[in-house]
Amino acid sequence: MVDLKAKPFYLDDEAIQWVENTIAGMTLDEKVGQLFVLMRRARTEDDIKNVLADYHQGGLRYQGGDSKAVHWQNTTYQANSKLPLLIAVNCDNGGDGAMSDGTFIATAAEAAAAPDTQTAYNIGLVAGREASATGANWMFNPCCDIYMNWRNTIVNTRSFGDNADTVIKNITAFIDGVHQSPMACCCKHFPGDGVEERDQHLVLGVNDLSAGDWEASFGRMYRTMIDGGLESMMIGHIAAPALSRKLRPGIRDEEIMPATLAPELLTDLLRQDMGFNGVIITDASHMAGIACMEKRSVAVPKAIASGCDMFLFANDADEDFAYMKKGVEDGVITPERLSDALHRILGLKAHLGLHKRQAAGTLVPPEEALSAVGCAEHRALAEKAAEECITLVKDTQKNLPIDPARQKRARLVFIQSTPTSKAYKGDPVRDVVVEELERAGFTVSVAPNFHDLEVEKGPSMENMMTMMDCGKMEEFRASYDVVFLVLNIKGYAQENNVRLRWSCNHSSELPWYATEVPTVGISLNYTNHLIDVPQVRTFVNAYGNTRTSIRTAIEKICGKSEFCGTASDTVFCGKWDTRL
């Protein structure tokens, strides 16, 4: 039986009665539907009505759209749902995770470089304000992973640090910021990512710490969040073999499952030992870390039977709903397990006051609330974060400051993620970099890029020959005073590790020029690029590819303000030459 008066619900008798009455009045289909958080592309009100009638979902996690479109969507969903919906958002960096016009404040890695936890608080504050203005009420954040392995790129920018103490301080501040708005938080990805280099989107993730080391790091962090009243926990498709073996002596290797399907991790450890009473939700169910471990018909009900309360997304909603319902009818999900899940789901809704707000017609704020999105106050917080966090990783050749009055002629070598679509027309971030360098007083010559040449001139061997041609060294030195190597590399769920990739083989983009003229490397995202360009002796982590981040980084490089961010040793990737 779930204690709804205890943390994190703190319900009074009236709210508990609403939970009990609601469950008592549900059909089996409605109970099954509450277990799902779905993402459906519903374009009209009729589409939304049909989705709700078919699946009776407990929650919504949407993807994309500007603030007005998201506000309309959330308003329409809530207006047509029998029960108030949990509407979830991913806001790792601020309000930009909730809508396309939201405010980017900083990445978690950027916040970890700050002198205090104020940046982490501001990320949560702005994320909560802007997301709640659209009607969202559930923050799928903070990311509580610990960045222990520099090769791990899936949490490189999303982790608040490489040790438990730094992460605990920052995620506590983030949650405090979010809680200034009517939103619940969700720590992810239990039992913890960042230990190995692989990505649970693509393979079974493995946290291979010993039980003792896990308890001293991830365990201590999760216990701190639970003690603080954390409302929900997202479970990663990540195995913890040492913990499973400790809790299930004799378990065979082939029986070790991701935490989403491991009752010893969810029920024995998280619920009973750690005392977590809040909602437990799976990570996205299309990820390989779960999808490749069991047949879909088994995995869907097994996740709930193992201890999850909610199931995130569906492969085919009709099919997954049928799998879940059959799991209930066949007893895979026991009546007690289903009851506990429903009590926690509805308990979270009551904790947020959604039942009262539904009755009052205030589940979604009026459209005027969208004035908070991208407001001057939030833009100022983004500028503050950039000013306090952008980090000079190294300047061993004492190239800084770069003075555009004396070193005016700049060569820009811009490296971007490899295009994945025929619709590619160039990276707009490069244009921003050029504009900001020119604003600072530089004249800018942009180095060729193979992908752009292929678009502009059509596929040709001449394009490769152009890219391989470095020209005469004497002419290069006579033409340029400084080179800016700017890296705008991002990746998601296509490869386990995302590394710097030059636009073609034997490319003239390679940093041979670092020995010819002063060269400054700037990363606009990942913090571990020195593994691929150790020969660049001046390197800056700017953390973001927004105009604010780019402008502030350039101003610091030019000596207009001091670098205030602090890098951890993970930026050097365990190599001696990256420090040179």
Where are these regions (language model features)?
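Preference for extracellular/luminal or secreted protein segments
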Residues: 1-54, 262-263, 272, 292-580
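Short, well-ordered alpha-helical
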Residues: 2-7, 13-97, 144-158
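Hydrophobic faces of well-ordered beta-strands that scaffold small-molecule active sites
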Residues: 32-40, 58-62, 85-93, 138-142, ...
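Active-site mouth loops of central-metabolism enzymes
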Residues: 34-45, 108-122, 203-217, 287-294
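Active-site-adjacent structural elements in enzyme catalytic domains
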Residues: 67-84, 117-133, 343, 347, ...
